[in-house]
Amino acid sequence: MKMPSASSIRWMWLGILILLVAAFARLYLFGDAPPGLQHDEIFKAQEGRALIEQGDFRLFYPSNQGHEGLYVWLLGVSYTMFGTSVMMIKFPAFVVGLLTIAVAYRVIGQTVNRRVGAIAAALIAISFWAVFVNRVGLRANTLPLFALFVVGGLWWMTRIHIQSRQQWIIAVATGAALGLSIYTYTSAFALFVAVGLFVVALMLFQRTTLRQHWRELLIVGLLGMVIAVPMVWIRLSDPQGVNRVSTINRPLTSALNGDSTELVDNFWNLAGMPYFTGDPEWRYNVAERPLFTTPVGLLFYAGFGVALWRVRRQPIVILFLAFATVGLIPSLLTVAAPSFLRSILALPAVMLFVALALDVIRDKRIVTGLGVVVIVITAVTDWQAYFDTWLQNDEVHAIYRDDLEAVASFAREEDSPRLLVSTTDTELDPLLFEYLQPPDDASISFFDGRTTIALSDQPALLMISPLSAITPPHADWLTSALGTTQLPSLLRKDGALAYEVYQLDAVAALASRLAQMQTRPVYIYNETNYPRGRVDEWAEATEYPVNFGNIVELVGVDLPRTEIATEQDGVNIQLYLHPLIERQDLPLNVFVHMSQLDGTVHAQRDLLGVPALQWTSDMMFIQDNFVVAGPTPPGRYIITMGIYNFQNGERLPILDASGNVIADHLVIDRVRAVAP
């Protein structure tokens, strides 16, 4: 058995060193950078759980506007290892990131040379772009790895002298990697284009190689297309298949309609991505920061030119050129370019081109020295950008929710706590919160503080986020006059405010308030046209509480003004609601209509500040259904309200004490619009 040479051993240890540095960059402040989880990660994690718990295996998952399935499969494996946890979400991205670096080191080292492979792999190991992506649990992580598998397979199949049987094995493996790539991320179509361009380059520059290996190349193409067919079919036949793209493709649709301004702007933004422009969103970048903030970025353009020059001699390089051009099309055609996430296929090519620019220098010792300088400069600037500038930005904390982690930590320290938590997203934040492992004995309900306040007839803690602060109509519930005591606040990981905490003792104040509210009657009237005159003259008063389908009851209404202006005004109405069921996933909403006397709706407000999945029997919530009237002709208008299923439009019936249906909406009162 032939022993490896000393040179090979040195390169092996260098590769190990690069991987160790990469692992450190991805594990340092693990769980704290990003500061918390974001909603896109939760969608994938939920599907990974469902894959294991319910056997819900899919090629394409329709949730969150639709996405490919391969990363969900990896999350399923992670769930079997770590359960419902942050580690479950982060682990696949970490492993895929290290594999990408290892494969880049090997593949680029063989297709170009070891020195270039080492520089490129090291840049992937420490660059902001790669480190960032590998620290979030999103499917884009997987595409560069599969792209490098395909590059390596095509190289070994057409350039390395191996036995025929091994060539066929490599061809099958490469075709499988090509086909499976379509299940990683939307940008994967560019990998198929790149393989086609590689074949064209062989036709133009190395026909002998093409004649020798056309059968293996045919296998790669055919197998890749066969494996990809189900996903292509889903994309073309399922409305969800293109839903994600259709929500962000304004530059394309505008160009098709004759206005190419945004498309041209996107082109220049993408062209300047290495040095001049950057992703404008804090979600995935220090907003507007280019990939490289030093002259290192200029090396990309030189390296791109070197790659073009080398295509005739090394057609395999055209794959990387395609990654850096065709791979940018998803960002070119969509909003917020340059999007670092949608451009992810270009990542290995960008790092390769920086290394290629250095490698043209004849003295390879200088190349090595400059490579080290480039790596160190990139590491220092990108480390500061990620772990300092980006991590301390308020917008980042609003996306990556470490404030919810503070709530979970607080709940673990309390004895069977009852928490009422304000949040901006009452659907997704509870799912995210579950992965932060709150205690099983905690009773926690989320509500939208921007429209609603949740109260309890039992001792409870009210937690108010600055992102979802209580509005003036409900602010008195935070005062000592209504029995509320402010406690020490919860802080984010950077020391900023996460949640204000209040001890509620609202039983007496709530009873007094309801007694006051219930002096205003509400009415039943089932005709479509409304008579003139006072409501109590033509509608039948009904008693509180008003039972909506044995699901929820209206226990009070506050309508402080019955006269509004015809301009820049609206109907200020507060609804007091009490659930009759607990934590059921019902698609409910509450409407308030401002109608003309002929029944035509002039304006309306639909909202439910506490989803039914968050309801408990001890809870009562008050929501501000302020109806923005807009320009309003002078006259009388009727205010009505009801509750409906927003999926099928059916209204909940109003039941009398015997359970009989008496209406499907309430008349609250009439208001008068008066010209200034």
What are these regions (language model features)?
Residues 562-568:
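Short, solvent-exposed loop/linker segments at the N-terminal edge
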Residues 2-258, 262-364:
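Membrane-integral, polyisoprenol-dependent glycosyltransferases
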Residues 450-556, 651, 656-676:
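Aromatic/acidic, Gly/Pro-rich catalytic loop(s) in extracytoplasmic/lumenal soluble domains
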Residues 290, 296, 367-447, 533-543, ...:
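Membrane-proximal, lumen/periplasm-facing interface regions of secretory-pathway glyco-
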Residues 411-440, 465-467, 572-597, 609, ...:
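Short periplasmic/luminal acceptor-recognition loop of GT-C membrane glycosyltransferases, typified by
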Residues 631-639:
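Short glycine/proline/serine/threonine-rich loop/turn segments at secondary-structure transition edges
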Residues 633, 643-654:
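Short acidic/polar inter-strand loop motif in beta-rich domains
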